[in-house]
Every structure is written in structure tokens, then in C-alpha cells.
Amino acid sequence: MAIGFICSSPDAELFSEKSRMSSSVLLGCLLCCMDWSAAVPGKTEPFRKLFDAIMIKKLKSCSAAYPSDLDEGSMCDMADASPTSLELGLSKLDKES
């Protein structure tokens, strides 16, 4: 499922750096981001689009922040991927609806 999401994402260049990136690191980053979905159950399609955009952004910053760790397959530190960004996005969605 995670690989399917990445391959089908509008940002397919995530895989263009495949030689640099360990799939376990990428999967680890994705799973950290996906934990957010449990915080806000039952949201609609606009929420999923926002959520996907946040995930892609976090994956890119994760791969950029830890280039030396990627070959070793270590887990990215996603502590800064707090629900704050998600909450800001959700409040924007609430205002639009």
C-alpha cells in the first residue's frame, strides 16, 4: 500500500532518487506521517488531498534532511511532523465549508 501511494503520487520524482534512498527509510517516514490519519477520522476528499500534500512534503524534507543516513536505512526523525500543520490545514478546510 505504501509503495502504491508513492508511485501514484503526483510527485513521482520521489522515486527518481531511488539510488540514494533506502526503501525502509522512505516507508518509515510514510508510516510516521500516516499516524496523523488516526487523529482525524471521517474526513472527506478535500481532507485527503491536503493530507497527501502534507505527507509528500514531509517525505521530501525527510529525504533532504538525512541524506547520509539513507544508505544505512535508519529511521527518519519525524518529531517535527506534529499535528500542528494538519490542524492548520483542517481549520482552513472548515472555514471554506
Curated annotation (Swiss-Prot):
InterPro entries: Putative_chemo_U83. GO terms for molecular function: cytokine activity. One of its GO terms (cellular component) is extracellular space. Belongs to the intercrine beta (chemokine CC) family. Highly divergent. It comes from Human herpesvirus 6A (strain Uganda-1102). It comes from the Viruses. The keyword Disulfide bond applies. The keyword Signal applies. Keywords: Cytokine, Disulfide bond, Signal. Disulfide bonds join C32-C62, C33-C76. Pfam families: U83. This is Putative CC-type chemokine U83.
